[in-house]
Amino acid sequence: MTSIKVVCRIRPTNQLEQDLGGNNVIYPLNDSTVHIETSDYSGNFVFDRVFHPSSTQNDIFSYSIESTVDDLFLGYNGTVLAYGQTGSGKTYTMMGIENNFEKEGMTPRMLRRIFDKIRDSPSTTEYEVKVSYMEIYMEKIHDLLSEKNDRLTVHEDKLQGVYVQGLKTIYVSSETEALDILNKGMGSRAVASTSMNAQSSRSHSIFVLEVVQTDTESGETRRGRLFLVDLAGSESVGKSGAVGQTLEEAKKINRSLSTLGMVINSLTDSKLSHVPYRDSKLTRILKESLGGNSRTTLIINCSPDSYNATETLSTLRFGHRAKSIKNKAVVNSELSVDEMKRQLYIYKDALSRCVCGARINNNLDYNNCHSNVWSGEHSLTLSNLAEKSNLKEAEIIQGNRTIQESNNDRDESTVASIHRHNFDSDSINRLYAEAQLELKQRDGVLSSTKQQLSDLMTALGDAQERYVELVKNHRVNSNLTANNSLNDKPGFTIEQKDKNFSINNERNNFLQKLSTLDSSLAALVNVQRKLIKALISKERPQNGTVIKKIQGGT
């Protein structure tokens, strides 16, 4: 589990604040600590990073955001949220100024970085990149890339997770295409002028990008989704001078942000068991970003001036609470069956070296170390292992450390099991012998099922041929009856009726058998699928993620 990364960005004073003649209330003490001094409060807040007013867009990107792109290519989901009061610099941080490279925001910089990495990738990797763009305005979801953009709804299922039904998705092949789409969507976003901000965003905007990469040699597929969120700013109606429609917008914005705050409170307070994700569209869409499968960065944007001291303190407290959220990010990866088998063999071989090293370090009787570490075709003896690898104590310790690190996220249960057995070879042999026996039994059942399926298909073919023959004979007899006017001959009519009755009975019996065969066939196909799935899952780690390679990274 990883915590949400929270960075604090303090913007320079703006013209309004300078005209009011206020003073600074917030001061960076170092790269991670900020001090705030107001008439009601004095204290420090610690974040992952604090950026002072002179920090550039590139400073923010290099420290806070670039690693999110790298994680995306490893198969992780990522989220970047900009939070703060109206006019605090959220949209500038996320979008920047168009056609100004130095002042480009985090979103266009990430798009450039993504396609740079694609260009630098091996030729054996294929990519698909698709984007979508939406806003949440007055608690309604609008598609910023489609004219028919109203009344989109949020749905959730086990396969896709949370998604917006009907949201337009566009495939892109370059940063130019992606930036054009981004700028088009930005032009459709709801804004209004207030006393606090001449271009105040009246909606939450969410730019979604998905990268799917496939290794054409191994068949492995990884996918990562990136949510780039520019939240509407909380605002004091008294300061912003909001009236009419702008006032109604402010109410909806504040209510939505209040729900976001309650979600964060619930995630960080062990006494609160219910997390109110469903209380707003924003929190439903960001469910995985807050406490779920995502590596999330929150950028809190602050005004330094005393005029906004209350709002700045509220923002700092929001960021401080968010730091306590634990996300459960996992690699979204699918390996081919051959690759899973290969990695399982590598894992077993490396783990056996750890077993050998532990025995040698514990001064066990070397002459008695001839028992198999693994049963079956992968069996190794400790004596052979020691001879072949010529392990020294330092190498053993380093090998042990490598195994621990390589399996840190994905095989914790297996490593814990080994520790519980104190590298007891009998226990390990028994566990793997049982696993291999079960696999052999499943293979036998699968072979038997395939044979039964083949027999059923043959029987079904024979039954179909018999049915065609019966229908053909029935038609011939019917034609003879009509052509010869045999209805006037009572004896023949009775005989024909008996034949028809027999044919109908046989036809009904056939249909009943056909129905039974169909049901049996469907059941067997279902069993076959379950067995294949069980065989594959038997070679996967229990937590459902992919085993890391012992040599050569993931």
From Swiss-Prot:
Positions that bind ATP: 84-91, 233-240
Predominant location: cytoplasm
PROSITE patterns noted in UniProt: KINESIN_MOTOR_1 (PS00411), KINESIN_MOTOR_2 (PS50067)
GO BP annotation list: cytoskeleton-dependent intracellular transport; establishment or maintenance of cell polarity; exocytosis; intracellular protein transport; microtubule-based movement; retrograde transport, vesicle recycling within Golgi; transport along microtubule
Subcellular location: Cytoplasm, Cytoskeleton
Presence of keyword DNA repair: no
Pfam families: Kinesin
Function of the molecule: Cytoplasmic motor that could play a role in Golgi membrane recycling.
Name the UniProt record assigns to this protein: Kinesin-like protein 3
Species: Schizosaccharomyces pombe (strain 972 / ATCC 24843)
